[in-house]
Each structure stands twice: as C-alpha cells, then as structure tokens.
C-alpha cells in the first residue's frame, strides 16, 4: 500500500466512513499512478479497487500497483456490488459531480448513506513529495527558458497572438508535454485586464507587455507571469512596476511554514496599499499548484489555516489601472523547512527591450 493511500485511509477513518468513491481523474492519478480518460477508484479499509474500461487494461497494469483492477464501463454497478458484499453502509463521494451522475449513484446505492466530500484528495495533495517537487521544478525551468527566449523574439509589430504562440511552442520544444493553461498575453491597455486573451493586436513602443504562462511536465504545472516594456518606460510605469516587484519580493522573503494564510495575502497587499494602489490590486495573492493550475490552498483574509512545509504556491501581486496598463509579477515558490525556495528564476528586474 503506497503512502498516499495510507494517508487517504487515515483521513477516511477520521470521517467515520466505510469507503469513498473517487472519480476526479487527477485524483485517480494521484492515488494510483494511472493516467487516462476513464477511471474510478473505490477505497475501503480492506479493498482498493480501480475500475476502468478495456482500452486501458495494459496501461493500468504497467502504471499501477496495489489496486484490484476491473474492466467494466458500469463502474457504479461494480462498486455497489463490492459495497454489498463487504456489508459497508457509510460511503463517501467527491461532491464536484454532475446531477445526473449523482442520480446514478443514488440508484446504485439505494438504501445506503452517501456522504459528499469536499476537496478530500485535494487536501492531501497540498503537501508535495520529492517526485512532485522535481516535476514542478522542471516545469518551472522550462518556463524560465521560454521567457528568456521570448525576449529576443518580441519586436514592435509582433502581435499578442504571435508572442503567445512563440511561448507555447518554445515550451513544447524544451520538453513540456503541454500547457498548464491558455497563455495570457496582454499589451498596452489590454494589460489592465488580469486575464486578458491574446489578440491580433501588434505590440507598440512604450507599451507594457504582460505574459502569464506555464507548462506541464510529468503532469505537473508551472505558472509564471512577467511584465516587460517595449522601447521605453514612463516614470509612472516604473513606479508601479517597482511597487509590484517590492510586494512580490517581500512575500518571498517572509514566506515560511507556520505563516498564516491571512498574512500570506496581507504582506504583499499592505505594500501595494501603502503605495496608494490598493484599489487596483483586485485579486488574491496566490494559490497552490500541482496537478492543477489552481488547487488548494487558497488564501483569504478570513482563513485561520497556516502554511506548511512542502506546499508549492504562487506569489502574484498586481496593479491594474483601467484604460492605461497593468503589471503583474508571478513566481512559484516551495515552502521548505528553512523558509521558501524560489522555483521560477527568470529575470524580473524592470526590463525594457
């Protein structure tokens, strides 16, 4: 039995459940090592079962150990039979499912108690092991190099889409298996939109260019943002940029295990507020990364939780002035026993090309 399943069973016992159904495919991968488009896991104290279809039987045998493997397209009927044979009554399930799937579950487990579980596996995924850290670190290094190469590619007249495509293709050339999300590439006024879509707009001299991008390596993500300037930069642009950079660096300097989620957000936000731009920082400071680009933990001013060693997090302060421009600087960091390790190493001093 692997360590992840052991941790799963401990948490399940704390919730007084007899078994749990997992059908989020990334959670299935996390627990079993199997990556595919069809897979459902049932875990109880005495049996751990993976149900998939015949297309994946060879792959499952190669990628998974410690699980019973069943090839059947009616996974709920298979699991219901196991539950009945074992005499189990309290069954948990992931709560992010469709209404139609929930109705199927009610029919398959008629007469049993079903208990929705929020972020059950995602809570375990918050703390990364060495293999996960290695994959995230590699994804970050690919993103770093793609950004450095993009600095030579970007010229006046290149469109946002052309620059975004360059980043995307370059990350694949460097070994990425895919993108962790659709690249955000925003220039000029568009950079005031935190999640702008790249357009057929040419970049022009004097504009800010914000690039938010990342890649996949062994299923794990990177997530990085850099803002640069084309040709020249105004005093106001430089002031705003350096304020965001100061906020970003302050969190890197102070992030450590035991820091409250509220303080994780407050440290950089206070710097932006003190500079007079508090109303222009309109999103959270960061989130966890791993198999998903946005995953636990999330940060808010009401949370009482604390940072823990092994968390991989983003640090992404920004200032966005509607009708003018915006700045965001985003790094990926790993919480260590002595503080934090910066995973994204691409330059972030004020860059004018």
Outline where the language-model segments fall:
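Active-site neighborhoods and metal-handling regions in enzymes and metal-associated proteins
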Residues: 1-353
